[in-house]
Amino acid sequence: MGKAVIAIHGGAGAISRAQMSLQQELRYIEALSAIVETGQKMLEAGESALDVVTEAVRLLEECPLFNAGIGAVFTRDETHELDASVMDGNTLKAGAVADVSHLRNPVLAARLVMEQSPHVMMIGEGAENFAFAHGMERVSPEIFSTPLRYEQLLAAREEGATVLDHSGAPLDEKQKMGTVGAVALDLDGNLAAATSTGGMTNKLPGRVGDSPLVGAGCYANNASVAVSCTGTGEVFIRALAAYDIAALMDYGGLSLAEACERVVMEKLPALGGSGGLIAIDHEGNVALPFNTEGMYRAWGYAGDTPTTGIYREKGDTVATQ
């Protein structure tokens, strides 16, 4: 095992230079870079991968640019339903929450489920009451709302569409995927992953995608890899996308790059799925593959300058230390 490393994502989809101003680009790049730098400093200080991914996703939830926490999209009923998961590659313990509306940071609730309950996943009112009982504050769902998200809901209604993220266009492979996530490898060789989302604009209330499902949108195992996904949630669930990366490495003998190529570029498209993922293997190799036009992403080894990206760039999808 080499240097500690962190990678994060803020969603994948039809993200082209023609559609985004330089000012918009800079806002995303600055936000992603700052969060990775925080994670790098934590790793340098010897903090655990689990703490690093939890904090990175919490910060992504606090940033209204991304569809998780503050800035989450609206359901068809003009409500917010948030999902999150976290997994510790050292112990294989995991925690997740789904359909929560009164918790500012769902990833912290997922961490509570993992550490303070005998369960892996809790949903709705029960998950919220559990979090309140363990010290999390009850907040008004209004804190998640932004004018842009509401405009997108109205646009989606007009189109009669369900959309994944903040473009306001119909749900298809051309759209941005509204999920955030983080993966990390710490100085002790432990891996961890976390994923959080506000779901899909104009979705039916009660819909749950891959983000809170261990093995679909999030997975970590010290023996192989940590993965966080973003994309067409229903397809990622059917493909067990996050776990499939680990399985191909464990049982198929594939490298991280080969496993990611198989899942993201072959298996998911065959099922009609668009999106991407971030992954770090137990040796510290990093992969950030996506089959869409772009993916908000950033990564960096402890002590190095963060690398950020939005669009597809030649040679930037896999990095080795």
Whereabouts are the PLM-identified features?
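Alpha/propeptide regions of enzymes that mature by internal proteolysis
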Residues: 1-321
